[in-house]
Amino acid sequence: MKVALLANPARGEINVLLATAYELIRLGHDVTFLTGSSFANAIAEFRSEQNDPILAARIHFSDLGNARAVEDFTRGMQSHLKGLRKPPGDYSSMEICQIVALVTEQEFRDAATMVRDRLLEIEPDMIAVDALSPNLVTGCRMTGLPWMFTVPCSPSLTATRKSLFDPHPMGRRRQRTLMSALENLKLTFIETYRNATKKDLYARRALLKNEFGLNSMGFNGDSAIVPPLWKDRNCVGGIHFNTPGLTDSIRQPHQIHFVGAGVTSDPENHDTPVFEAASFLKQLSPSSSTTFKPLFPPLSKTGRDLDVEWMDEAYAAGQLVVYLNMGSMFLWTDAEVRSCLRAFERLYEQSGGKIKLLFKLNKPKRTPNNTGASTPTAPISSPDFEEKQRTVMGSARPVGASNLVSEKLADAIKNVTPRRKTDADKGYSQFTLSEFEGLEYVRFTRWVHDQRSIYKHPALRVVIHHGGGNSFNEAVHYALPQMILSQWFDTHEYAILAERFGIGLRSKHAPKIDENDLVNTMTRLLQGPEAEKIRRNAKVWSIRSRNAGGAPAAARLIEAQAMLFNQQKQLELAASEVRAAVDTLSGKSSVADLESETAFTPNMLSGAASTVGSD
């Protein structure tokens, strides 16, 4: 059967569909991705990773071009980053996400009709579209074909709010108290007012109703970042890549299936966590040994992975690693990088050299206020930069080095001068990785080649991230305690959920990155009774996430809907043949009865799939 997958090519949206496609092609189905041109290379890489020509031949790419309505919105988000980063409860963060996704009336019309025409040409047995890609969603609705949607964001965005006590997606108070009800009322009023005053939203609502002939989902629903898509007459269900039960938004539509993290069926994703086996073996190792040599291959490698090798060395030295990754959209400022370094230098010293940091540092490829081409390199020269760099480069030391060297490292962190491209980049870190080679307690990386190897490494103890849906749910899947430095929109909800369900801690200063907050929170996560309780809770929720099925469950749900739609087409074809025969032999007297017996609706598909999913 043929399945069409649609999403904006931003990694947060497309990654779960890649995992789902991995499963669908192994079930024998053909998968066609419909997205922007920038995803072409990723599709080619995805094909080559299959190492099987039969599987690779089942992967297809339908290029939707490079128009703003179908291309990666990551750069657009980064251009609004300073306004986007707001504390919990601030509606403007959600509004900026909405504004970045908005396009003009003509751009919206062109994108939706192109998607409709392309899908009708492909004739898929089932369509699955990312709920955060409104232009693509509209094209799917216009086909009249059965379709599904995928949700890679927080649970409250799909929840039905029937009373003021049901938390608003941007709500800071989520305990169903009088104060939370007042906050929800305020946020709902702001949302309604802002939706009514945006001309592009008004034009989009008019297009949906008057030109496209699509049914309304309500005033705020038609304008929402995640509309109530299950209300569309051809929608047969949704797939939520979140763990069942790990939510405070309890009124979820029955058409939506929670499948946990978007993790594939690869056995490497589901075996015993390496750190548990390693801890058990370490207890059995001779007490006289100063280093522990694993009795099993630490990690399978297809090539050198310098990040993993660095973690191997830390583990052999009895050190613990914290992994810091703020996602592909986040850009660090120089002050924030320094705050992190000072915090982890303190942790390193307080632990006697036992705590180290793996730091994924994004580098701005374009100027923050411009989505055009990259700016030419124009580093600023500093008279004492070379001397400061020599201080950093020459400061590597073994565990237990003198306090004098430690003080020099601290001075190097405070004084290091960043290399910048242009003044337009002011405020965003342009550090070169070589500047940190002397800091023994931290390793910087621009790109993680195999994040699974990081998550499963026996040295890893805590993950720090921004609260993105994929980051949060992958940490849950791998039973990793997490610290969430939430930054915008629904990341605050994930931070609140982590703390409420006892699987992590959140920053009390979000979205600011504070040195003392990092030190205090990491100390709580790495040692003591609270840390042990969080580790136990993380293991329990890991089981619940794995039981939900992940990408294999998503693929089976799509397959079930495709099979039902295929049966519908066969029934309709058989009915038309019978109708033609009846017309020839005895007129049309019994055709109406025949049509009523063979009629099939998307609602029946949705109900049937719910039965399949619950078996």
UniProtKB/Swiss-Prot annotation:
Keywords: Glycosyltransferase, Membrane, Transferase, Vacuole. Pathway: Secondary metabolite biosynthesis. MELs not only have high potential as eco-friendly biosurfactants due to their excellent surface activity, but also have attracted considerable recent interest because of thei runique properties, including self-assembly, anti-tumor and cell differentiation induction activities, and moisturizing and hair-repairing properties. This is Erythritol-mannosyl-transferase 1. It is found in: Vacuole membrane. Residues 367-380 have a biased composition (Polar residues). SUPFAM superfamilies: UDP-Glycosyltransferase/glycogen phosphorylase. It comes from Mycosarcoma maydis (Corn smut fungus). Its EC number is 2.4.1.-. InterPro entries: UDP-glycosyltransferase. Its main location: membrane.
